[in-house]
């Protein structure tokens, strides 16, 4: 499988590749996905959080932040797998030009900082910034923004404040990994929601919101423009670990097709873009695929001597 993708990249000139990643790239880091066998969308009680609901009343915000308080520790501190590390090596080698991701876990940034996760406040920058061509379409769960003054702050700092304000709740309840969502959300009982104490922006007292694109929100226009520019100038577009079900990602595949940019899809099962690609690799492990691609194109094993 890696052989076919490596040949595809060589045929496209070994440069200016644009990558589009989804939740399937992070499952091997312990972050649950949406549409896999145990994915979020297969759970009967799943109801997406929309911006409208989030703003409609304090009870909805209490429910979100209660879930997030218990679920965040699962996605915080996650380490990169060989998908993230392989893509970073391809970027360093000049093969990959831009990396567009639907993921909010910050692991593509972390790859540029060695790939080892940490739950410390100091690790914030490693999950939220890098010079590795990453463009986060849906935001970053490790950041929180104030809806009044616009201040962006570390989610880990908010976790400390939430746990201090809800000390007894934190002692009484522990998140189970099987219930945690890809964005660090966690299903909690109503009694927890009722007891939840919210905290406000430390600068202006405004409402805090996760710095991610909620269901029904639009990807920021500048981000969309940047992504379109990268895709239209690419030698190829490689979609990794994504079923491309949401239009915010699918539109870039359509743009590549319109521009005559060759498309490869590397993921498990069917996608919404099937039939538009030049190459389809069906795999349950994007990490294994990337290990093979790096070995063939760059001549070394991930984690070994370069």
UniProtKB/Swiss-Prot annotation:
Location(s), subcellular: Mitochondrion matrix
EC number: 2.3.1.286
UniProt-recorded Gene Ontology molecular function terms: DNA binding; histone deacetylase activity, NAD-dependent; NAD+ binding; zinc ion binding
Gene3D superfamilies tied to this protein: SIR2/SIRT2 'Small Domain, TPP-binding domain
Amino acids binding NAD(+): 22-42, 102-105, 241-243, 287
Note on cofactor: Binds 1 zinc ion per subunit.
A Gene Ontology biological process term: regulation of DNA-templated transcription
Residues annotated to bind Zn(2+): 146, 149, 201, 204
Major location (coarse): mitochondrion
PANTHER family associated with the record: NAD-DEPENDENT PROTEIN DEACYLASE SIRTUIN-5, MITOCHONDRIAL-RELATED
Protein name per its UniProtKB record: NAD-dependent protein deacylase SIR2rp2
Organism the protein comes from: Trypanosoma brucei brucei (strain 927/4 GUTat10.1)
